């Protein structure tokens, strides 16, 4: 990695000479930043220790003469089965402004096992001034044996930082690692400067349209209007009210690798940066769709951020984080709801496919079309008065399907501000109904591997989906959908016990498999690994060496792109191996006389025979890894991204998405289903292809009940809409008592999510459903109570607009229904540590009910207590209730 950072922000290439005036100017450092870390060279000692460094768990040794240039350093040495080692230093900052940090450090290694990961790294945790954390920002060192190498990265906080802890960390590997010359540098931002997509910005130019260009007006029938001259937006109106601000607007672009300013496109070109743009605007009845393509005209690799910006002064408006949370817009910072990656201009990507801002008069949303994924961010910037979508594109001639270019599609629309983010979400469903089609008519719980026929009284447990197809005939008889198991993006390589756990030894085992040492199936997987294995920036295959309960060896990360080319020496890619397994499983379970298949949009698993679909395990496994393997670029279907040094690469989740789309098309054409595990962790766009979604969880961490947060559960529900989402609890079931099982069941009930159980080690070692302890018998009464309620809710269907509220905001409210007879369900949850009471009221007219409504509390089994125009409710901590409102 490069030794220096030429601008405030990144490891830059030569700056492109720009002739036109930029729309927004980037501030470049006139002086070095402030060094915050004390004694980063470990030379100063107090009582034999390098002050003010502290030990991380098992700590470190101080070693005079072994540092860089013969100086003093720290060393961590770890053997198999030992704990974690490292040196840590916490900086109390109490900042009131936002500034970037540059994290640097050096390390050398001797016989370090495994592959690069955050277990051997510079590892930084921060706590923001508002108390929220940002954990695990890392730069990883190479494993094996190597001389001193430097790692550095830019940490871009979203908010002012209260404290920062820097670790020289060594865990999860064996061997010996030395650390030296660590530093944390804070880059000053001049007065009035703001952070804009990871770059410090000062001097935002007032938008000056080309008055020679003709006016172009784009209007919807519901009152949204854009007026443009060439690329500049001169008017933004909602309901006839002007909302536009004199801010840079339209399509803007910044060359990340060249550390350029931000420029606008003129007549479809940005000559200053050597880029062209084709953009088409499609005004519809209730939205404006915008699609196009940006192309490099310089004939070399590029790392570029493309933005489409609406000029909007939304000071005093609300920014919606999700259906439950919003923030008042003010100050000069960016408002965004993102997940962290290691690529792109600021290492961020939006969590939701839509962003919504509103006040009492107007609501405005920007949204990605999930059929056109990319690394994108939806942002409101209070300092620049811009509401925009930003794309990070890596451009290279090697992407044969779109050489040196990247395509995009997004929409702009208005929504009813009275319901904020929920109304924006409902409108998104209306705009993209095909992305939320529910093909499962009969929902139920998720059974992993165990033959359901072997569970006495299985009907009590509400099974709907069988992972692993252990007894397809039985599942067919009882309306349970069965799925063939595949894991798209990996090869788990079992290694002989006497083989050292190193990269080279793993490749040796793999090549022996290729030669047939362990049979035909192992040979095919070896070929697929050598064909589809993704590579890091040094050209090495991604390999994580580990001893998992199901595999002692290592796991290679593979691209499941079906179009990756094979060779006579390596005649398989990963997709081919999986397609072969899928075809064999369907043939093996083919009924002698198949009944007619329903239309895909109304498929009922009860009406099918044989396998009902494909199960993709670990969908977001390795999702954030970056693939630098150039021959894989040739078959890319999604725009490339770029790394911290501006090098184009593939984000792994896009390759998995491509395979997912391929399998989904095959299954849906046959009236079958697609099920995936480990989905809706960080990414939204895989959800539209799926019919059943789920993940494995452990809500009993370190002996304490720690359920997934409301924000996490909200995200799952919103992106599924009315599709089933299922959980599998992997925990110590002896300690996960019936009281906790009930809390788990009630929390799932509130969101319409199916609770399930698997195995403490997620490895079928002593699974819940097959254990001699028969945990399901202990919990059977709870299943019998909650499964019928859950089935009724999910059949009625979740709705984003509740048309109901509680006067105590600590009692959360969701809505399901109406049923065919008009019955509506309001689910209620106390997500606090204290008993909460309040009055629930509903807009009966909006819910299609009359004033003489009957209200029943279904969990407690009693009539709801009337209170004025609503119903009185009191809930214990983590308790849920269902109000059934009927005519």
For every predicted segment, state its role.
Residues 190, 218-508, 612-613, 771, ...:
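Carbohydrate-recognition beta-sandwich/jelly-roll modules
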Residues 484-596, 604-607:
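Active-site-adjacent "subsite" loops/lids of carbohydrate-active enzymes
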């Amino acid at each position: 990695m490069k030794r220096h950072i030429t601008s405030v922000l990144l490891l830059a290439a030569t700056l492109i000479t720009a002739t036109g005036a930029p729309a927004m100017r980037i501030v470049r450092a006139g002086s070095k930043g402030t060094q915050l870390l004390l004694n980063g060279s470990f030379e100063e000692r107090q009582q034999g220790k390098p002050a003010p460094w502290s030990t991380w768990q098992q700590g470190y040794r101080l070693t005079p003469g072994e540092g860089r240039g013969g100086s003093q350093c720290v060393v961590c040495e770890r053997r198999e089965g030992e704990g974690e080692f490292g040196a840590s230093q916490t900086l109390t900052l109490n900042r009131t402004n936002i500034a970037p940090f540059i994290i640097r450090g050096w390390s050398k290694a001797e016989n370090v096992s495994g592959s690069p990961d955050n277990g051997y790294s510079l590892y930084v945790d921060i706590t923001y001034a508002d108390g929220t954390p940002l954990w695990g920002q890392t730069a990883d060192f190479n494993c094996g044996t190597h001389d001193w190498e430097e790692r550095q990265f830019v940490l871009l906080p979203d908010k002012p930082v209260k404290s920062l802890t820097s670790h020289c960390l060594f865990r999860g590997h064996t061997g010996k690692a030395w650390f030296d010359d660590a530093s944390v540098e804070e880059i000053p931002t001049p007065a009035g400067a703001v952070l804009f997509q990871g770059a410090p910005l000062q001097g935002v130019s007032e938008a000056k349209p080309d008055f020679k260009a003709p006016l172009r007006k784009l209007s919807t029938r519901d009152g949204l209007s854009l007026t443009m001259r060439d690329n500049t937006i001169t008017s933004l109106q909602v309901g006839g009210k002007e909302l536009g601000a004199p801010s840079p607007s339209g399509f803007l672009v910044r060359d990340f690798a060249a550390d350029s300013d931000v420029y606008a496109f003129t007549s479809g070109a940005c000559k200053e940066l050597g880029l062209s743009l084709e953009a088409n605007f499609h005004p519809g009845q209730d939205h404006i769709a915008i699609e196009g393509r940006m192309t490099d005209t310089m004939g070399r690799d590029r790392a570029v951020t493309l933005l489409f910006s609406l000029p909007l002064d939304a000071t005093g408006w609300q920014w919606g984080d999700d259906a439950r949370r919003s923030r008042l817009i003010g100050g000069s910072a960016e408002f965004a709801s993102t997940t962290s990656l290691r690529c792109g201009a600021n290492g961020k990507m939006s969590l939701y496919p839509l962003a919504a801002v509103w006040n009492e008069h107007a609501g405005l949303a920007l949204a990605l079309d999930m059929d056109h994924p990319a690394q994108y961010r939806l942002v409101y910037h209070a300092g620049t008065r811009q509401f925009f979508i930003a794309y990070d594109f890596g451009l290279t001639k090697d992407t044969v399907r779109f050489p040196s270019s990247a395509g995009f599609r997004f929409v702009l629309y208005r929504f009813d501000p009275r319901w904020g983010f929920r109304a924006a979400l409902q409108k998104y469903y209306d705009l993209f109904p095909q992305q939320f089609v529910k093909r499962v008519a009969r929902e139920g719980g998720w059974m992993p591997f165990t033959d359901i026929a072997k569970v006495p009284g299985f009907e009590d447990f509400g099974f709907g989906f069988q992972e692993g197809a252990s007894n397809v005939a039985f599942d067919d008889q009882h309306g349970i959908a069965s799925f063939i198991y595949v894991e798209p993006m990996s090869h788990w390589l079992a290694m002989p016990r006497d083989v050292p756990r190193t990269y080279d030894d793993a490749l040796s085992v793999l090549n022996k498999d290729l030669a047939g040492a362990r049979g035909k199936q192992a040979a095919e997987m070896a070929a697929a690994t050598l064909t589809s294995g993704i590579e890091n920036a040094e050209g090495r295959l991604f390999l994580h060496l580990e001893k998992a309960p199901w595999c002692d060896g290592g796991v290679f990360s593979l691209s499941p792109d079906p179009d990756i080319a094979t060779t006579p020496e390596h005649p398989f890619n990963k997709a081919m191996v999986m397609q072969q397994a899928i075809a064999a499983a369907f043939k093996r379970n083919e009924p002698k006389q198949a009944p007619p298949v329903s239309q895909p949009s109304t498929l009922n698993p009860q009406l099918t025979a044989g396998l009902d679909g494909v199960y993709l395990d670990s969908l977001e496994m390795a999702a954030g890894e970056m693939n630098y393997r150039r021959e894989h670029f040739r078959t890319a279907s999604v725009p490339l991204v770029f790394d911290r040094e501006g090098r184009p690469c593939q984000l792994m989740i896009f390759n998995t998405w491509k395979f997912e789309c391929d399998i989904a098309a095959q299954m849906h054409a046959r009236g079958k289903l697609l099920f995936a595990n480990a989905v809706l962790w960080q990414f939204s766009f895989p959800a539209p292809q799926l019919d059943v979604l789920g993940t494995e969880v452990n809500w009993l961490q370190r002996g304490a009940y720690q359920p997934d947060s409301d924000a996490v559960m909200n995200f799952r529900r919103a992106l599924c809409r009315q599709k089933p989402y299922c959980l599998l609890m992997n925990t110590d079931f002896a300690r996960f008592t019936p009281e906790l099982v009930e809390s788990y069941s009630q929390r799932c009930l509130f969101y319409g999510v199916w609770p399930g159980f698997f195995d403490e080690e997620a490895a079928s070692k002593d699974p819940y459903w097959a254990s001699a302890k028969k945990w399901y018998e202990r919990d059977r009464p709870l299943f019998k109570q909650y499964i019928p309620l859950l089935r009724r809710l999910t059949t009625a269907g979740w709705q984003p607009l509740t048309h109901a509220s509680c006067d105590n905001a600590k009692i959360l409210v969701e809505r399901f229904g109406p049923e065919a007879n008009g019955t509506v369900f309001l689910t209620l949850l106390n997500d606090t540590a204290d008993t909460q009471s309040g009055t629930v009221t509903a807009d009966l007219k909006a819910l299609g009910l009359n004033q003489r409504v009957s209200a029943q509390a279904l969990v407690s089994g009693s009539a709801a207590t009337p209170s004025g125009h609503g119903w009185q409710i009191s809930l214990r901590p983590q308790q849920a209730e269902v109000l059934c409102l009927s005519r």
